[in-house]
Amino acid sequence: MNETTIASSAAASPGEHTHSHDRRMPGLDLLRAIAVVWTLLFHSFLVGGLGADWQWAQRYGWMGVDLFFVLSGFLIGSQVLAPLARGERFSFGAFYLRRAFRILPAFWAVLALYLLWPDFAEAPGMEPWWKFAFFFVNVSIDYGRNAAFSHAWSLCVEEHFYLLFPLLALGFARLRSGGAVVAFCIALVLGGIALRTAIWLHFDALAPDRNWFVEDIYYPTWNRLDGLLAGVALAVLKTYRPALWSRFGAHANRALIVGLIGMALAFWLFRERAGLLGNSVGWPVLSFALALLVFAGAQAGSWIGRRAMPGAGWLAAVSYSLYLIHKLIYGLVEMHLGDALEGRGYIAFMTYGATSLFAAALLYYIVEKPALRLRDRVLRHNAVRPLVPMSAQARSDG
């Protein structure tokens, strides 16, 4: 029951550095940086935890991935919806090309490391390579035996979102019915509550000898749509109701406060992480609270959006690489320094974190960033018009 990730929100994901000097959204950079650090804290369970001093931050660190999902829904949703709102033709080719260059190079590089040096992995067993290559591992995994690189589950959710959302958006744009969109969203939320409740009650009664919470509730895409939906709802508001978005933006700090209160409620609902209460109604509550934080972060006048936090932009830029590689580095550091770091919470976190940051920087500058430059050259060569004018922050998920 110890899995989470961040993923990448790969579009929620870690940001992608660009060479543009357009205005960034420092509030979203800050949220992304918080999400990745929170995830690193949570995954310290792999190396024995970081002690009582960090337990308060470690316990709910799995929520970092949900923050990435909301960010992804908002930023990618905005990219897809903007041309549709203007009545323009949406380029599926350009969209999927951007996604492929954004996600695959760093992902393939880390997958290769796991396959070539399995002794360094954070867990002894690993699912077959093809489940990762086809982004299938989140719906077919033996977590008890094959937990290595299992944090790729959130990338699978993201990829499924990339494949399906543009089609849904195009369909609803042609339907031109706001009521249908609202009904679909309500059905998705209520259906998710019902499905997770049914799965939980079924397996709680059977009590199978496996980690059914992770395998059947936490990982599968159909149970993890709340965060993406909350982010897309923000994108719909911004794209189709810009005046309302601006009006609400004047109250961004109130939204931030309500969002933090909502987070406190989510902590209470998930006080038993694998319990029925959290896994039935907890996900929509958590996603709504995180959406309020993202909304506040997207406003230039909010407390978290008005100025950049030193280091947050860079950490946001490398967060995808950091997410991908940190568990592998945890395993490597534990192999060589585990005994010396045991029980030394602050020093242990700094050691594991700094080593992971160094590895992430290498992955980012050697693989991820050159791939993004190549993507831009390919798009220019093919004379593919950008999907939508975006800030540098939005392109960080482009």
How would you label these PLM feature ranges?
Residues 93, 97-110:
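Alpha-helical transmembrane segments of multi-pass membrane proteins
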Residues 129-144:
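Extracytosolic (periplasmic/ER-lumenal) interhelical loops and adjacent juxtamembrane/interface segments
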